[in-house]
A protein has these predicted regions:
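Thiamine diphosphate
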Residues: 112, 116-119, 124-227
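Glycine/aspartate-rich loop-and-adjacent alpha/beta segment that forms the canonical ThDP
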Residues: 205, 215-283
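Short acidic, glycine/serine/threonine-rich loops at helix termini
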Residues: 77-79, 106, 156-158, 184-188, ...
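N-terminal hydrophobic or amphipathic helices/low-complexity stretches enriched
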Residues: 1-16
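Generic beta-sheet signal
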Residues: 63-65, 141-145, 172, 229-239
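Glycine-rich beta-alpha junction loops
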Residues: 40, 71-72, 76, 179-180, ...
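Cofactor-binding active-site loop characterized by glycine-rich and histidine/acidic residues
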Residues: 20-23, 35-166
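N-terminal capping segment at the start of a domain
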Residues: 13-29, 177-179
Length: 283
């Protein structure tokens, strides 16, 4: 990947983070922490990797993206808006009465959303069904699903992993957001799921652990997924919850609340400065 390409993706990721802050500030609620930390992977999927068309969001031959950690909907909405599925201005209607941008993704109302999610563990299960369906149909469709590391405390995730392995779903890419925080504290103290890499390998997954904020690493890991033709892949994304907003970073306090006016102003100042630095670097 060239430096110019990485800069372009970094700008998209910055816009996604701005969208997260705009939406959760307007709503006065939501989940900014776990939304901010998946900006890079969403930017890469939406602008580089996935076969999608904002003008034809229901194309049966499109790749699929399932946000299994559905509470991170602000990031998914911001990414879809950035990609052109709907107006960026609509992000400010997040969680409002009458808005199509609900607190969790709704496949029946939001263009570009492939599965309604929110109940943890169910998204990855649906993604398995999509991948198996594509296999049976003989279609070259890849299915990507983003999970949280708190989410994998749900037993349904492991049933889905067993299913994916049993059916050899090599077209399924599980992207596990490993930020080590969940609503009640650290994942290590609430319910330690480590060692995740070894456990997933025992479930016969192709497993890679990468820096989830590094575009080169994301590109290489997805290339490894595409090269695998016998078993499902899990890319463990080592991330920083709240990435990009200093006072939200690595803080469980920002799992599930929106910024007030003062916090919003500070967050946007930081993100605008980050974007300006990218623009300067791109000259």
């Amino acid at each position: 990947m060239t430096n110019a390409e990485k800069l372009t993706l970094a700008k998209h990721a910055c816009h996604i983070r701005m969208g997260v802050i705009e939406g959760t500030h307007s709503a006065k609620c939501g989940h900014p922490g776990g939304s901010l930390d998946i900006a890079e992977v969403l930017a890469y999927l939406c602008f580089v990797e996935m076969k999608v068309d904002p003008k034809d969001p229901k194309n049966p031959d499109r790749d699929r993206l399932v946000l299994s950690k559905g509470h991170a909907a602000p990031a998914l909405y911001a990414a879809l808006a950035e990609r052109g599925f709907f107006p960026v201005e609509d992000l400010k209607t997040l969680r409002k009465i009458g808005s199509y941008l609900q607190g969790h993704p709704n496949m029946n109302s939001v263009p570009g959303v492939d599965m309604s999610t929110g109940s943890l563990g169910q998204g990855v299960s649906a993604a398995c069904g999509m991948a198996l369906g594509a296999k049976h149909a003989g279609k070259p469709i890849n299915v990507y699903t983003i999970l949280g590391d708190g989410e994998v405390e749900e037993g349904e995730c492991w049933e889905a992993f067993m299913f994916a392995s049993h059916y050899g779903l090599s077209n399924l890419c599980v992207m596990l957001d490993r930020n080590h925080l969940q609503i009640d504290g650290t994942t290590e103290t609430v319910m330690n799921s480590a060692p995740l890499e070894e456990k997933l390998k025992a479930f016969n997954f192709n497993v890679l652990t990468i820096n989830g904020h590094d575009f080169d690493a994301i590109e290489s890991a997805i290339a490894a997924f595409r090269a695998e033709n016998e078993k499902p892949t899990c890319i463990i994304l080592d991330t920083l919850k709240g990435k990009g907003v200093s006072f939200m970073e690595n803080s469980v306090d920002w799992h599930g609340k929106g910024p007030n006016d003062e916090e919003y102003a500070q967050a946007m100042q930081e993100l605008n400065a980050a974007y300006a630095a990218l623009e300067e670097e791109d000259k």
